[in-house]
Amino acid sequence: MSNVVLESLLKPLAEFYSPSFVEEIAINRPGEVWMRLNGGRIPWVSYRSEILSKQYLIDLIHTVANIYERPFDPIHGTPVVYATLPGNHRFSAIAGPNVQYDENDVTGGVALNIRGSGVSDTSFKNYHLERGKKLLKVKPRESNRPDDPYDRLMSAINDGSPILVSGATSTGKTTFLNHMLTLIDQNSRVITVEDAREIRVPQKNRVHFVLSRTEQTNDFNYARLLDLVVRMTPDVIIGGEISTDNASVLWEMLGTGHDHFYTTIHAESSDAAYAAYADRILHTQPAYNRTELIAEMKKKIRVVQLSRDGTLRAVTEVV
């Protein structure tokens, strides 16, 4: 009986996620669904659907939680639900004050992904693994660092290198990061992680996660956030300012293989930025070797250093 109820409730969504050419769907706000197409020139396409109201989406999450015996209390308890739906579709959802689409979501929003189980008749050839053939280098990030600082930054943006925007207070780090986002493909799916909403994302396919440092009312913490973000299939991940609360999780997130990972930190030079990031990680993960951690950061992360002298703000390093 429970499957009958769930399948009936899923009907408005099934027309979007059931076709074989659809890899997954994402809902970032009521009334709109994004479909990720297999092999599409533009991977994400959006459709409006008034049936997908906020109340419908909340009811759906509650129903999934009840049927699969998952805890779900978006205000005071657990705002995230994971499940495997009929047809082996993977379901990930969040509702409440920790998720927003825009500033109008003052009481909280809702976001969910439903992902297919994959092509059943695949083979190793689909992954370009064949006897006697060399493995492909997919988006190799060999150190392409032009001499010109402008070209060096644009190269980092274009190849998806992680970028840390560093600077002292009032050097314009967030403003600079907001401008960088205008240079990213407008068809990209962007997820931000902040303790207060500051980042302005021009891409329409976006989700904002908010974890206040002072108003934590549920168990949706940075560790649980990591699990959710990777299930939400971002093309771009924007971390808020690095703190002792989020540093280790953002470092783990950077290691998940996603391109275009951007965040900011308070520091007065690129070397100080690497050191400050490492020190914040060590506050919660003391087992790391500091020297080795900084060396690994220098391999993976580009730093853009901003400095200020009175009203003058300038980029002083691009490494």
Where are these regions (language model features)?
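Short aromatic-glycine motifs in intrinsically disordered, low-complexity regions
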Residues: 6-19, 84-86, 286-294
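P-loop (Walker A) phosphate-binding loop of NTP-binding proteins
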Residues: 156, 166-169
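Switch/coupling sub-region of P-loop NTPases
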Residues: 161-166, 179-298, 306
